[in-house]
C-alpha cells in the first residue's frame, strides 16, 4: 500500500479557475463543506429489463448512504447491461460479451471524467461483473465491486426450478415429453423476483470469483438479492471503499497472481461456468497479471469439484448461502492448503483474517461434499488442445459420464441452423454438432449456445451428442459441450475447414480435441475456402476489428502488451 491523499483526484476542483466547475457541482447539492471531502462514485448497471438488475438503483442508494456515513460525498451514475437470458437465442446475444467491454469502458470514462477519488460498482447480470472489474483494474483507484445477489429458486409442484428448467423444457416439449401448458407453467414460476440466475451459472461464478480475488466484501457474493444480509453488504461497501481511501489501498495491491490462483481454485471447487476462463483472463490482463489457459489446467488437476450445485447438481446458490456461503467454502479450502491466506483484500485484512470471522460449513449439510468424497476428484473445467483447437478450447465436464466421445461432425455456420436440425431430429446419438463463425470476431461477440445445448439435453441426448463451438456456453449449460475453440473460424482456425462427416474426438482424460483430417487435406481445404468478411457497422463492427482471441480473454486492448504508463 502507498500513501494516497483522500482527495487525490477531486482536489483538481479546488483552484480559483475551477469556479465554473464548482458552480455545476453546487447545482447537484454540494456545499463548501462537501468540497473538503472525497468524492466517491457509485455506478450500477440498473435496468428494468431483467430481474438480475431491476433492483440495483435502490442498491445504489444504499451504497450512497454507506459512503455518506463514512464522511465522503457520494455521486450515483448508471451504465448499461445486456440480459443474457433475454438475448439468448436471438441476434441480441451478439451484444452480450460485447457489453462487458462497453461496461468497462463506460465506467472508466464516467469515473475518470468526473475525477472521483474512489467508487463502488454494482452489478447483477453475467457481464456486469467482469466489465466492472476490468474498469477497476485499469483505473487502479480505491474501488469495490458489490453484487446484486442471486435470485431465489422458483417452485413448481413442490420442486425448485430456475430459468434453465424452462430452456430444457423446450427440448422436452419438442421430444414429446412435456406439453405446451407444462412449459408455460415452468415459464410462469421459474423467476420469482430480483437477482442473478440461481445456479452456479456465470453471474454467481463471477461474483464468487471477485469475492475470492478480494475485491468484494467477505460473504457478499452468496447473499441472496432479497435478503437483509444483501442490503447490509451493499451499504457496507460504501463505507469500505472510503476506508480503502484512508488506507491508501488500491486494486493493484489486491489483484496479485496469488489472488487469481485462488479465484480459479474456488471456481473449480464450486463447479463454476466456462465463462470464468474468459473473464479471469481479461481481468488479469487489465491488472497486468500474467495468466494463461494453461494455468487453469494446472489448478484443475489438483482441486476437486465439491459443490452439488446446478446445472449439474441439485442445489441452487441460495442453498449454499444457507449452509455458510462462499466464506465457509473458502475457510474449508484454506484449512486444507488450497488457498493463499496471507494476501490482502479490500477490507485491509488478509484472506485468513477475514475468514476467521465466519462460521464453518453447517454440520450435516449436503451442498458441499467433503474432500475425501468429492463430486469429482479433479476440477470440472478443462482446457483441451489438438489439431481442432491449437490455441485451446474449454470444456465443462461436471456431471458428464462420457469421458471420450468419437463421432461424425455435423457442421453449422449459425446456431439457428443447428437448432433447426435438432428440432427436426436430424441430430442422432453419436453425432458431434459443430457451430462455427460465432467466435469473438465471427459472431461478432461470441454468443452463447444455451438454447441449443438445453434442447439437446431436454431431448435426452446430453450424454450422447457432443456440441462444439468457437462461441460460448451459458453457465447454465451442461452435457458434452466444448466452447471457446481457438483460433476461431473467422481467424482461419482449423474449425473453419471442418466438414460434415469428419470424425472428431473429444477426450477429457487426455485433454484432446482433434479431427481426423490430414495436414495435406487441411491445406487443400484452406485453398478452396473463402472466409467471410468481418462485420463492419456500428459497435459490433468496432468490436470485431479489435477483439482478441478467446484464448487471451477476448479483450479489446491487446495492442499494448506491457501497458506501461497507461494508468
UniProtKB/Swiss-Prot annotation:
Which GO terms of the molecular function aspect are on file? 2 iron, 2 sulfur cluster binding; dihydroxy-acid dehydratase activity; magnesium ion binding
Cofactor(s) in the UniProt record: [2Fe-2S] cluster; Mg(2+)
Catalytically driven reaction(s): (2R)-2,3-dihydroxy-3-methylbutanoate = 3-methyl-2-oxobutanoate + H2O; (2R,3R)-2,3-dihydroxy-3-methylpentanoate = (S)-3-methyl-2-oxopentanoate + H2O
UniProtKB keywords: 2Fe-2S, Amino-acid biosynthesis, Branched-chain amino acid biosynthesis, Iron, Iron-sulfur, Lyase, Magnesium, Metal-binding
How is the cofactor bound, as the UniProt entry phrases it? Binds 1 [2Fe-2S] cluster per subunit. This cluster acts as a Lewis acid cofactor.
Q: What is its EC number?
A: 4.2.1.9
Q: Which HAMAP family match?
A: IlvD (MF_00012)
* Name of the protein this chain belongs to: Dihydroxy-acid dehydratase
UniProt gene name: ilvD
